[in-house]
Amino acid sequence: MANPNKRIMNKKSKQASISSILNFFFFYIMEYFVAVDNETPLGVFTSIEQCEETMKQYPGLHYVVFKYTCPADAENTDVVYLIPSLTLHTPMFVDHCPNRTKQARHVLKKINLVFEEESIENWKVSVNTVFPHVHNRLSAPKFSIDEANEAVEKFLIQAGRLMSL
């Protein structure tokens, strides 16, 4: 005869597993909307120290520097910005990849930069990481602290120009 206590324990174990899975997805989705769909992106900083402070506040996020070069631009200007990446599995952009146009457009929209839609697919995109633990999981060149600071400063100047248009 089956042990009734064992049956109850198995049932509770299954309920706990289902509950933990549901909780994981709930918080994952909530974190996504808070971090990625927030109208004020977490990733626009004036220094790496500010990045580190924000990372302490949002430990689940990995900060990535995206560097976009648009050949359609007369000056071939680089636009550099920091954006929070929820997981390291977030799709990264690769060089000359038209099928990522929609994703690139989505990211650019989130930081309120306005570009001609048809030119985005021609952009050469390179991904640089600020933090070594992110770099180790991506096949991308790593920024030094000085390079990252320069990138952030350059982005802030560039963003200021675009916002004034």
Curated annotation (Swiss-Prot):
Induction remarks: Expressed in the late phase of the viral replicative cycle.
Annotated GO CC locations: host cell membrane; membrane
Location in the cell: Host membrane
Residue ranges crossing the lipid bilayer per the database entry: 16-36
Chief localization: host cell
Transmembrane helix in keyword set: yes
The entry's keywords: Host membrane, Late protein, Membrane, Transmembrane, Transmembrane helix
Membrane topology: Single-pass membrane protein
Domain of life: Viruses
Family per record: Belongs to the asfivirus F165R family.
Name of the molecule in the record: Uncharacterized protein F165R
Source organism: African swine fever virus (strain Badajoz 1971 Vero-adapted) (Ba71V)
